[in-house]
């Protein structure tokens, strides 16, 4: 697979929707995650990320303007032992509870499907990073309608073992802006991952469409020790 520029992918797409990037730092020492949300409606834009325990949750910036909270208020990031879960919806909890019960990432997500927001039927995208005893691997998933037909849910899981230094994968909900919004197609895109969390955070935030970007989370986990650094950027302040 040809490696693509994360910067160009984002700058060339006004509305990829929600996006997950997972990979390994260039020096090989850090497990890396990024998650961003965007919005076109006032309701979608009325959000911020806040820290909650070892993870984060979304919160209404102006509670008086909050509508339909079920699809926009959730915990995108949760940590269970050696696993860090990142998703674009409340399936974070589904994966967390499944792993807790001994299920796999893929099996945990079998109880879920795309979001019921017709006509877009927004895909549910998810990732899990496993860091243990100096080893690191990750999985990504997308659950989406069958080319806009909600009678069928198409399920794809991608597993990456013994991750290569300086590489990662990027998956997002929509191919581009549109009405209805077309679901992501193909494998997660192969991208470069830098060593520095602040450089990675700046790369993502500065490349996202200025009008549509809402919030960004990044995390670098030391593969040897499990200690991590986190950055959160919110457009609403």
Task: Mark where each language-model region is.
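Conserved short alpha-helical segments that host acidic/polar catalytic motifs at enzyme active sites
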Residues: 1-237
